[in-house]
Amino acid sequence: ARKHVQELLKTFRRIDFDETRKSVYLQSAKFGVQSQLREPLTKKVLNYWDDVKLSKTCLDRMVTKVNDVKETFYAGFSYACESHNQYSVDCLEAAKPSYLTALGEIRGETEKCLTTRLK
């Protein structure tokens, strides 16, 4: 189980957070990934036996989708925010629910394709 957690955490390190972006956005984006994906998936793989292999294709797809969703979240916080001042906490709060929902959907998809049994 420990090797599964290590593999999963290594995968999460591949998610690209642009550190030049505003800290309020970065904190929110990272917390979303942690709470909606990393913690639930880590708890799940802790229960796996050693004869279970994590699907690299599935994990790669998760990283790609998370990076896409983060960009949409950033757009909602910045240039696509029309109802409030761009880069404001109001824009961030307006964009956050759809970001968290999208991460939850990615978690569901990832849970379905996460494992393959070793023969």
Swiss-Prot record:
Q: What is its main location?
A: secreted
Any one GO MF term held by the record is: toxin activity
Q: What are the alphabetically sorted keywords of the record?
A: Complement system impairing toxin, Disulfide bond, Secreted, Toxin
Query: Which Pfam family is one of those matched by this entry?
Result: Aegyptin_C
Q: Name one GO cellular component term.
A: extracellular region
Q: Where does this one sit in the cell?
A: Secreted
S-S bonds: C58-C113, C81-C91
Q: What does this protein do?
A: Salivary protein that inhibits the alternative pathway of complement system activation in the host while having no inhibitory effect on the classical pathway. Inhibits activity of activated host C3-convertase complex C3bBb (C3-CFB). Enhances accumulation of C3bBb on immobilized properdin.
Q: What is this protein called?
A: gSG7 salivary protein
Q: Which organism is it from?
A: Anopheles freeborni
